[in-house]
Structure formats: C-alpha cells, structure tokens
C-alpha cells in the first residue's frame, strides 16, 4: 500500500473507533480495532494503561453520557500516527466523577494521537478539555474571590 493509501486507511480505522465504538457503543468493533498489547500513554484516572482500561473508560463515558458522540474536525497522519481534533457532545444522564446526573447537554474538545499498525490501534496519547466539561455539569466553579490576573505583555 502506498504511503497515502496507508495514511487514509489509518485515518479510517481511527474514525471508525470514534464513530462506532465511542459514538455507538459497539464493543465488538472495539475488539476488532484495538491490538491485544495496546498501550495508553495518557490513561485517565482509575483506568489502566492497556486495552482493558480504555474499554472501561469508553463504557464509563457511555453510561454517564448515553448519547455520547464526536464531531471530527480534522485528522493528520505522520508515519503510523493519526492525530485527530474533535469535539465530543452528550447529555449528562449518569454519574460522572462523583457528580450526579444533571441532564445537561455538554461538549468538550479533545486531541488524540493513535498509532495504527497492521490495521490495529496500538498506542494512544491524548488531551481533553475536561475542565470545561466539569464546569458544564457543575463539578468545578471558580471561587468568587479568585484573584483575577492580567496577562503580561
């Protein structure tokens, strides 16, 4: 497969994970897409940095936000790595990080990098704007007396 064709195939695998696993909760597809020895280099709290930990995280998110879905804004490839910038959406219908359901609609941005080798997702690095999510469900409210600082030029 040419470099461009393999890049497009890798993007399609990551997109399929985003749409079918995260967005629809299809864990049969999860088993198909993730390598047995998958490593999450930026695991979330209370998860393990392996395939089981990511499966647990995805299931937890779908329980808290049953209509969880993502809008992919763009994807780039570099070798076997696919970087995806997306916005997640959902409705807070289940407990999340100790916060009871608020039934509020949420959204937050995320950037993920996934390595794809031999048609399988082998590695993940990612950052998500969880502070924004927590603010939307009342999990973090800045104190009224918090000092306001101006940025220096």
Protein language model regions, located:
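C-terminal and inter-domain tail/linker signature
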Residues: 1-153
């Amino acid at each position: 497969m040419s470099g461009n064709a393999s890049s497009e195939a890798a993007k399609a695998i990551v997109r399929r994970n985003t749409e079918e696993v995260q967005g629809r909760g299809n864990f049969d597809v999860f088993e198909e897409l993730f390598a047995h020895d998958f490593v999450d280099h930026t695991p979330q709290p209370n998860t393990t940095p392996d395939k089981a930990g990511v499966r647990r995280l995805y299931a937890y998110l779908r329980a808290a936000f049953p209509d969880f879905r993502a809008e992919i804004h763009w994807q780039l490839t570099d070798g076997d790595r696919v970087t995806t910038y997306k916005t997640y959406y959902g409705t807070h219908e289940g407990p999340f990080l100790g916060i009871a359901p608020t039934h509020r609609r949420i959204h937050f941005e995320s950037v993920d990098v996934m390595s794809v080798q031999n048609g399988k997702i082998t590695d993940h690095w990612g950052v998500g704007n969880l502070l924004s999510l927590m603010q939307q469900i009342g999990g973090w409210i800045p104190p009224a007396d918090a000092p306001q600082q101006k940025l220096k030029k």
